[in-house]
Amino acid sequence: MAQHPIATLNEELVPRLPPSSPTLFEAKKKKNLSFEAIAKHVGRDEVAIAALFYGQAMASAQDIKKLSEILDIDAGMLESQLSGFPNRGSTLDMPPKDPTIYRLYEIVQNYGQAYKAVLHEKFGDGIMSAISFSTKIEKETDDKGEWAKITLRGKWLPYSRF
């Protein structure tokens, strides 16, 4: 199985990120740890950990303790940097410029109306929550190559009549 390099921080993003992001990414790079390895230690999903690194998720006291342990970062400094509410959605231009992120945007452009129609047929008038939500990424391999499998799981929230 081929080992791929770990994800590091794109310096162009730094002005849009909280102070914790460079701290976390520098320690991740120094230790040569994947998000998967960090997530296993913390006890969370790797996408949740990556979101935390980019300032898009809130860290619990337990998350901070575990991150401090695995990354050898002072817990007090990490707690100070990770306190407060995340400024979600602040890292992206729309439409996105990065090809990987643009493909996700393109999926919504191409299939968004179809997703909406099928969701409404299955659940009724409402929306899928991105708050009561989880996601995961899996790698599948078959005779045609490697495939990315992204699962989105959100609670269905029916619109209220008033």
Curated annotation (Swiss-Prot):
InterPro entries: Cro/C1-type_HTH, Cyanase, Cyanate_lyase_C, Cyanate_lyase_C_sf, Lambda_DNA-bd_dom_sf. The active site is at R103, E106, S129. One of its GO terms (biological process) is cyanate metabolic process. The keyword Lyase applies. Transmembrane segments: none annotated. The keyword GTP-binding does not apply. Pfam families: Cyanate_lyase. It catalyses: cyanate + hydrogencarbonate + 3 H(+) = NH4(+) + 2 CO2. Keywords: Lyase. Its EC number is 4.2.1.104. Coiled coil: none annotated. GO terms for molecular function: cyanate hydratase activity; DNA binding. Belongs to the cyanase family. Catalyzes the reaction of cyanate with bicarbonate to produce ammonia and carbon dioxide. This is Cyanate hydratase.
